[in-house]
Amino acid sequence: VTQWFRVLADLQELSCDEVLVGHQKISAHDYGHCLLQVVEAVSQCSLTSNREIACTVGMALNKENEDCKFIIRRISMLTAYSPNASRSLLLGIVFAGFSILSPICVAYSTAGSLTNSRAKEVDISHLDPRMQQIAEKQITTAVKQYHAKSGVIAIADPQTGNIIAFAESSKNKGLESWKLRIFSPGSTIKPFIAAAAINSGNSSETKNYDCHSPYYIAGKTFTNYNSNVESASLAEAIAKSINVCLIRVSQEAGVSVIRKKLTEFGFDTSTWWQADRSDGLQLAMAALGENIPVTIESLIKSYAILANKGHSFDKGNSAIISETTSYSINHMLENAVTNGTGKLAVIPGVSVAGKTGTVIENNDKYLALFAGYVPVDNPRYVVLVVIEEGYFSKNGKTLVSGGELAAPVFRNVAMDALSSANR
């Protein structure tokens, strides 16, 4: 089916060429030049893993075809419509397009394009039946309650990083499983930005930052949810998820510090990092999770490292951050629940550390996230909740954020897990 779909798509492109050039709507030379401009644009952007031009890259390269150059064949076929005088010019265009696309084809055959990237499937070989039952019950309830497209809950052991529960639910069959899904972590990345900055000596919980918005970097505008915020400490910025503050934190720490530490926490800082954009812009995007792709497993394991006092799960159990930094992150994430955007995750009598996240996909499609662990001082469970395109109405408002949708689900899962463990 996939192959026939691709063939039909190719025929559709060729039929457009026939209508435009064959019926003399545009000269073959001019049309060929337009196609060459597409090739040139792809050559400038394709090697940067730019998500915005993924479809154009696919059209130009079509790497399933053995010669990898469908667009070049389209330009070549235009010579059939052109008079002898312009035929040589079109052949020149073909050669130019070939020269531009050749290195791109080689690069894509090695690295692959974003649209063809595949996540490693979630490891579910360590599931705990009791935790699995809790996760399945809670995600089924949440998807129904929030009229969501889909949702997923994962629970991990903070001592090993192993996933001990993984449950997903959707209102429609045939949706891509969260076991393979790649997505943006949104504001759930912010504790790791803070950890990198504190650990490097560039920041602290109490350090204050200018948080005025809008904030402009290289033509891109960044704003805060609350546009009235003027300044805040790092702890306040984490609690209230102040975008501009975290951007400034990342800029002070620097590209090398942030990328290195995020990589050590298990984040991919290469695939969505765009070489054609400035380091300042890329760093700002990273501070908000916009160019850091994650999976359910990679994100929950990063939070498990925080719960494990900053120690990784490799053979040496190496420390990614210092004990002092770990204490600061725990304190800030606990404050984010008691006094910040995660208030609906509060569990009476139990200390909770966590961070909300709200990701906007395709302009009006939302992911509501909450990641955290309980209890803070001696964590027993790490929990990640993601709700896709969920909502509910309250006092005439439609609520879609991680703090409003995912945080209450986290609370229910954590309460049930702790109760089950104490029986």
Question: Which residues make up each language-model segment?
Answer:
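Hydrophobic topogenic segments
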Residues: 1-119
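Alpha-helix N-cap and coil->helix boundary residues
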Residues: 11, 26, 30-31, 70, ...
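Small/polar-residue-rich segments within soluble enzyme cores
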Residues: 115-121, 125, 384-385, 404, ...
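Conserved, well-ordered alpha-helix/loop/beta-strand core segments that scaffold catalytic motifs
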Residues: 119-151
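Beta-lactam-recognizing serine transpeptidase/beta-lactamase-like catalytic domain environment
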Residues: 129-131, 149-181, 196-391, 402
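Short, gly/Ser/Thr-rich active-site loops of penicillin-recognizing serine hydrolases
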Residues: 401-423
